[in-house]
UniProtKB/Swiss-Prot annotation:
Subunit structure: Octamer or nonamer in membranes. Monomer in the soluble state.
Assigned protein family: Belongs to the actinoporin family. Sea anemone subfamily.
One term of GO molecular function: toxin activity
Organism: Heteractis magnifica
Chain's role: Pore-forming protein that forms cations-selective hydrophilic pores of around 1 nm and causes cytolysis. Pore formation is a multi-step process that involves specific recognition of membrane sphingomyelin (but neither cholesterol nor phosphatidylcholine) using aromatic rich region and adjacent phosphocholine (POC) binding site, firm binding to the membrane (mainly driven by hydrophobic interactions) accompanied by the transfer of the N-terminal region to the lipid-water interface and finally pore formation after oligomerization of monomers.
Entry protein name: Hemolytic toxin
Signal sequence range: none
Region (Plays an important role in the hemolytic activity): 3-12
More info: A synonymy between H.magnifica and R.crispa is controversial.
Location of the region described as N-terminal region in the Swiss-Prot/TrEMBL record: 11-30
Domain of life: Eukaryota
Keyword Ligase among UniProt keywords: no
Length: 54
């Protein structure tokens, strides 16, 4: 029925929103790690310690 199709579409849409948010959060964490590694290679160890201690 149309109502069931609407529910499935709404559920799929919500699933994509959640996935998008999760991927966004993972991206932020990856960037923090990348920044920490850059700082480490420069030799600024304090920035690495601050970024790694969540």
């Amino acid at each position: 029925s149309a109502a069931l199709a609407g529910t499935i579409i709404a559920g799929a849409s919500l699933g994509f929103q959640i996935l998008d948010k999760v991927l966004g959060e993972l991206g932020k964490v990856s960037r923090k790690i990348a920044i920490g590694v850059d700082n480490e290679s420069i030799g600024s160890n304090t920035a690495w310690t601050x970024x790694x201690x969540w």
